[in-house]
């Protein structure tokens, strides 16, 4: 456990450096997302470090924009789609309050402002990218956060293995420095999946240049925590992402991937093998398909257009991001959500057609595979709605938008 003075000290230093240059604040956000973003102290309960830094970054960014007389929102292909998703979220909250389907207006607006925070993170990262050096700075920041997070995972499970009742020791979520257990292991694993795919794509794109070793190390170190999270959706998403990378961009690595698929399972502990055997359609129907059916039955009779309102129930109620979006924001919100995801993939594809630098291509390829992986993981999880994986997704997507703007 870290002392409280260190927690506050890191937050203050990140805030101070932000006023010098916004990229320092974005670096602080990327690392805070990766390590332990939620703290419980005597002064503040459940304080998220990146939220504190986000306020400082936004204020510094706002002042910089006013000083330079630049438009607040940088132009990206996703601006209108982001505006549409923010609009549908706001409408769902307002109508949920008016119709009485939203238990608390505070919870509704909290969820909407968190969405706005993600949009601002996306725009600030995209706006800060002015050169290849900026891309490398922010990319390394994101990867350092993921490496630190992976190290925590290794400490919690792999290095402190216990055979008591056949279960490993530790909470293994790399989420809270102190206080009760935080997020589920599958949310932690989904965060690592996206970063692992970015690291793998960047390593393959840079190979055989010396710079390929760092992203390769990132990808390698994240695999063990992902596997030992026992998250079937995260493991399936990782496999889909790897096959997306090899099938679309790096076919020369496909034989190596296929060989690894044969060798690695034989090396896994029996406990993990049993968990992986649960990756089946029958299991999915029993454990997850009910969420879709429940969302339709509970939403259509009440308010099919805008749903019950953001935050009316926890994510565990429907167990996947699509049913949750339908129930919370209705058909209109689901359309906005899917349109935004399609826009992300389209932007990434356009960017790949415009850039030739192997470093830039590696990042965009990894983000493309990560987006596909999150779409698949969303069938039985909430990677694009849960805080930590959604933050890393929009950080990297903002970097792709910045590359698109170069």
State each model region's role.
Residues 173-186, 269-308, 313-329:
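Membrane-interface loop/short-helix elements at transmembrane-helix boundaries
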Residues 65-73, 126-138, 204-212, 252, ...:
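Membrane-interface junctions at the ends of membrane-embedded or membrane-associated helices
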Residues 151, 157-160, 226-229, 246-284, ...:
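A membrane-periplasm/extracellular boundary helix in multi-pass inner-membrane enzymes
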Residues 255-259, 369-377, 383-406:
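Transmembrane alpha-helices of multi-pass inner-membrane enzymes
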Residues 9-17, 86-90, 94, 116-124, ...:
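Alpha-helical transmembrane segments of multi-pass inner-membrane proteins
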Residues 17-44, 50-116:
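N-terminal hydrophobic segments of proteins, predominantly signal-anchor/transmembrane helices
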Residues 223, 314-350, 376-378:
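A conserved mid-to-late transmembrane alpha helix and its immediate loop/hinge
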Residues 2-13, 35, 47-64, 112-120, ...:
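Membrane-embedded alpha-helical segments of multi-pass membrane proteins
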């Amino acid at each position: 456990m870290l002392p409280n003075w260190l927690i506050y000290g890191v937050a203050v230093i990140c805030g101070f450096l932000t006023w010098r240059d916004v990229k320092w604040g974005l670096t602080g956000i990327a690392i805070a997302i990766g390590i332990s973003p939620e703290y419980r102290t005597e002064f503040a309960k459940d304080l998220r470090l990146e939220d504190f830094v986000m306020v400082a970054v936004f204020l510094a960014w706002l002042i910089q924009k006013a000083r330079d007389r630049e438009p607040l929102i940088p132009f990206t292909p996703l601006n209108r789609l982001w505006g549409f998703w923010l609009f549908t979220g706001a409408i769902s909250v307002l109508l949920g309050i008016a119709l009485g389907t939203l238990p608390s207006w505070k919870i509704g607006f909290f969820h909407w402002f968190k969405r706005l925070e993600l949009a601002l993170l996306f725009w600030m990262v995209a706006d800060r990218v002015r050169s290849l050096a900026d891309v490398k700075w922010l990319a390394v920041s994101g990867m350092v956060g993921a490496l630190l997070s992976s190290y925590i995972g290794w400490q919690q499970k792999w290095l402190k293995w216990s055979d008591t009742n056949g279960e490993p020791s530790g909470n293994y979520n790399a989420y809270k420095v102190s206080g009760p257990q935080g997020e589920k292991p599958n949310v932690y694993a989904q965060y690592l999946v996206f970063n692992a795919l970015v690291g793998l794509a960047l390593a393959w794109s840079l190979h055989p240049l010396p710079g390929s070793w760092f992203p390769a190390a990132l990808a390698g170190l994240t695999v063990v925590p992902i596997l030992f999270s026992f998250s079937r959706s995260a493991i399936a998403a990782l496999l889909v992402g790897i096959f997306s990378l090899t099938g679309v961009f790096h076919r020369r690595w496909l034989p190596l991937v296929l060989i690894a698929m044969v060798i690695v399972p034989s090396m896994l502990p029996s406990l993990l093998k049993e968990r992986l055997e649960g990756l089946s359609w029958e299991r999915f129907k029993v454990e997850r398909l009910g969420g879709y059916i429940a969302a339709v039955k509970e939403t259509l009779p009440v308010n099919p257009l805008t749903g019950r309102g953001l935050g009316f129930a926890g994510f565990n109620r429907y167990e996947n991001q699509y049913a949750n979006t339908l129930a919370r924001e209705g058909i209109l919100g689901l359309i906005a959500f899917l349109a935004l995801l399609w826009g992300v993939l389209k932007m990434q594809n356009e960017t790949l057609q415009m850039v030739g630098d192997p470093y830039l291509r590696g990042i965009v390829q990894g983000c493309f595979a990560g987006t596909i992986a999150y779409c698949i993981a969303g069938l039985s999880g909430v990677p694009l709605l849960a805080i930590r994986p959604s933050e890393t997704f929009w950080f990297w997507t903002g970097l792709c938008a910045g590359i698109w703007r170069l």
